[in-house]
Amino acid sequence: MRASGASEVAPRLTNATATVPTAQPPLQLSLQFADARHRSVLGRSKVARWLRAALAAPASITVRVVGEEEGLALNTQWRGQDHATNVLTFAYASQPEVEADLVLCAPVVEREAEAQGTSLEAHYAHLLVHGALHAQGFDHEKPAQAQRMEARETALLMHLGFADPYSLSLRRQSMAPASSAPPRSRRR
């Protein structure tokens, strides 16, 4: 398992105006809905497109959408935070293949999208891109890391047809770092 702050992952983009490569790596995707309220927003092809845009290597990713209770339990257990958060990234490998679980808390995502005045689709796309970048070693604990990660997210989301998420009314919503994860055997 790799901590989210690792820096040896080669960047695909150097700044927010960089072009996004058109060739996208293979993705093995599993979608789980413990909370199905936004299932219609998270169609398999959309989720795969959003994740592939952010990936620099082949990947095996599980996306799990949970309710407040499970989101709180996971954030408390793995980050020591007594609240549910929007996205948790559990990265198990990032080279040569990315292996990760992304956990999205539907009630938190819904509240944030409403507070930011953005669509659920745009916010989910942002959080999935954000989580995929964490799975590849990006982090935002330090200002320079945050600037690099935000520039990458912005470029990718604009390439996908979404607005800059950091220009919205509630700039810098708390994003969950992915520094801890449970041990897991590799899927093969």
Predicted segment positions?
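An acidic/histidine-cluster motif and surrounding catalytic segment
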Residues: 1-124, 135-188
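Short active-site segment of divalent metal-dependent hydrolases/proteases
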Residues: 129, 133-134
